[in-house]
């Protein structure tokens, strides 16, 4: 019986069509093959990437998730002067909102040895970690903008290895064009490729001394201050919403799309970028937030990309309801209004 898995990523990677999912974990080689066959010492550890037997597909993308656009005449202004407008009649020249959040759907098949390894060594540990965090809807933080400064933060992503380790690419395929309109996926002659590039195992290693328990630095309104523009399905998009800035989170390439967790064991947002003279500040887009007063919503309204609210036109719980996922089973059992908005909505 196949397994259907949903994984969060940052939307920018999704848009540039990085459809082949790499998974990463620290594995002891004896679980895969004899170390001598791949030139590694007995008991050595490595950073492993494997390709799923089927190409992942997009389950959810956070675009057009609020009923606002940035008209062309507003787009031409200085960013601090730009004002998003309530959407009435959208023009082709208008800029639409997006958030740096997407979900991939991955099918794993038990008759595939690689899929089994992915499930056993990556998916199952992730499920166990989720259950240890509470297996609850409360795992998603829903704070007002004055609350994040009281927490410390942890990034959930690739493992941190202090020592040099090999990189193993397991069962990778290549594309070969046979005809003008046909491309086939074929296995490489070797079932694995070993590299000793030390940069791969340290994808999210901090450049500073601090690695976990980082502190809040400030709130950041992406709708007013960010110049992140993209084109998607013939439309222009600019990032929209609230972000928090975390100190000493200057992580290297590959860490974008990781979950940011606070010290209350709650998911706060998606890590997506850096800033500062030495890239010492890390940015994470909030998935949910509450406004305490109208002034906090003057640049971007309080949205909820997970459970939805009156301001959010597109959110993940709509997909969860349609496909009857584990998340929606929890929503359906809940009587807490902050989680149940989707129950009375048509999907």
Curated annotation (Swiss-Prot):
SUPFAM superfamilies: Trypsin-like serine proteases (SSF50494). Pfam families: Mycop_pep_DUF31. Gene3D superfamilies: Trypsin-like serine proteases. InterPro entries: Mycoplasma_peptidase_DUF31, Peptidase_S1_PA, Peptidase_S1_PA_chymotrypsin. Belongs to the MG067/MG068/MG395 family. This is Uncharacterized protein MPN_586. It comes from Mycoplasma pneumoniae (strain ATCC 29342 / M129 / Subtype 1) (Mycoplasmoides pneumoniae). The lineage of its organism: Bacteria, Bacillati, Mycoplasmatota, Mycoplasmoidales, Mycoplasmoidaceae.
């Amino acid at each position: 019986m196949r397994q259907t898995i949903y994984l969060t990523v940052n939307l920018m990677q999704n848009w540039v069509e990085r459809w082949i999912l790499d998974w990463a974990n620290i594995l002891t080689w004896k679980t895969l093959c004899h170390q001598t066959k791949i030139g590694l010492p007995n008991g050595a550890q490595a950073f492993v990437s494997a390709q799923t037997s089927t190409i992942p597909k997009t389950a959810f993308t956070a675009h057009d998730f609020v009923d606002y656009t940035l008209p062309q005449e507003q787009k031409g202004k200085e960013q601090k002067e730009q004002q998003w407008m309530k959407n009435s009649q959208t023009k082709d020249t208008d800029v639409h909102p997006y958030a740096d959040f997407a979900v991939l759907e991955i099918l794993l098949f038990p008759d595939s040895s690689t899929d089994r390894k992915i499930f056993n060594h990556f998916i199952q540990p992730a499920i166990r970690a989720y259950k240890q965090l509470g297996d609850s809807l409360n795992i998603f933080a829903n704070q007002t903008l004055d609350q994040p400064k009281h927490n410390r933060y942890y990034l959930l992503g690739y493992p941190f290895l202090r020592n040099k380790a090999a990189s193993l690419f397991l069962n990778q395929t290549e594309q070969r064009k046979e005809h003008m309109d046909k491309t086939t996926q074929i296995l490489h002659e070797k079932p694995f490729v070993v590299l000793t590039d030390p940069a791969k195992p340290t994808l999210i290693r901090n450049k500073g001394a601090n690695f976990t328990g980082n502190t809040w630095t400030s709130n950041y309104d992406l709708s007013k201050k960010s110049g992140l523009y993209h084109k998607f399905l013939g439309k222009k998009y600019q990032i929209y919403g609230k972000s928090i800035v975390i100190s000493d989170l200057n992580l290297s390439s590959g860490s974008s799309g990781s979950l940011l967790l606070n010290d209350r064991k709650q998911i706060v947002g998606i890590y997506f970028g850096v800033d500062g003279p030495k890239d010492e500040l890390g940015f994470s887009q909030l998935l949910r937030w509450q406004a305490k007063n109208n002034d906090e919503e003057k640049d971007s309204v309080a949205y909820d990309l997970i459970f939805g609210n009156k301001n959010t036109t597109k959110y993940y719980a709509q997909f969860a309801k349609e496909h009857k996922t584990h998340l929606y089973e929890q929503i359906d059992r809940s009587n807490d209004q902050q989680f149940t908005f989707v129950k009375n909505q048509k999907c």
